[in-house]
Amino acid sequence: MRVGIVGDGIAGRTLYRILKIRGFQVDLYGQEKYTRCDIRPCGFATDASCINLVGKLGVSPQEYVLRRDNYIIVNGRRIKGDLYWIDKPKLLEAIATDIRYDKPDIDDYDVLVDATGIARVYSSVIPDFNDKKGISCQHRVILNGYVAPAFDVIRGGYLWTIPLGEREAHVGGGSTILPSNAVQQLVLDHVKEMKPNEIVCSCSESVRLSGPIFPVVSDKVITVGESAGLVVSFGAAGIHTAFESAIILADHIYEGDVTGYDKAIRRRFGWLRGIRKIWDSVEKGQVSLLSLGASYRALRYEGLKPTLMDLLYIRKALIEANK
């Protein structure tokens, strides 16, 4: 079987590396980047389970960990967790570098994998069921002192501060309701409050928050990672899901059961649709107590360890911000 992969992010490179190791004929096609860090999306946060997946690629994950924290501050409240802040550009280079930048001919491949994320370049044949996107903007800054990991709820989203070592941070925000200029101003005000020594770089982008978009297999085109809608709406976490879905797809290609990949993704990530529905309610300022169980699952997947009181606190903050 000959496999073409379009998109050289986490999902695309992970799939490429596994299939090459297993002896498949596989080509990886990259996309032109417009950011200083040469990645999109510009994310650095993940969790212990995801770090373990990195180890399965024959890569030493600890070499790419910038910092590890056992808590995060959410609207001023300290919540326990096991969180990793990674050097994503360096990790991507370690996973795969043999990348083509010409346009693939679909007829050259038995399977063409769309790993293009928000763009879904080759997935027009796949129904885009109730798609949902949020706008985000972010700055990488150098600070005078220690920075704590933090999230602060805003209307339709949140502001974040992600440590990249001891004196550097990724500071940004995103919303599914506010216009991009409003998000940019909130983030810029947040950055100014931190009084950074230097703003290293800045960028804006969209992120898919639709939940899984099925089917993920249509003829010879297959979606993976964000292209398949596999992003956790709470926190817009997509690194873990990108690794995991790529590994699942690699196993199904190896077993010659490509059609079984759709069922496997539904079984593993179907719960993300429930999280999407909760976020739809959040936008209206409505967060049911019945949603706490699903919210807990999402936060645990992202590396947090919230108590019931933590969940109730977050629920109240979401309702207040989205009145």
Segments predicted by a language model, with ranges:
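Short beta-strand to alpha-helix junction loop
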Residues: C42-T46, R77-A94, I177-A182
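FAD/FMN-dependent oxidoreductases across multiple families
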Residues: I79, I99, P179-L249, I253-Y254
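N-terminal FAD cofactor-binding segment of flavoenzymes
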Residues: Q31-I72
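N-terminal Rossmann-fold NAD(P) dinucleotide-binding loop
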Residues: G12-R13
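C-terminal helical "tail/cap" subdomain of flavin- and related membrane-associated enzymes
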Residues: D251-K323
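Helix-loop-beta segment of a Rossmann-like dinucleotide-binding subdomain
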Residues: N70-I86, L164-S175
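Predominantly flavin-linked oxidoreductase catalytic cores and closely associated redox partners
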Residues: D8, A94-V200, I213, G229
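Glycine-rich FAD pyrophosphate-binding loop
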Residues: G4-D8, I18-R40
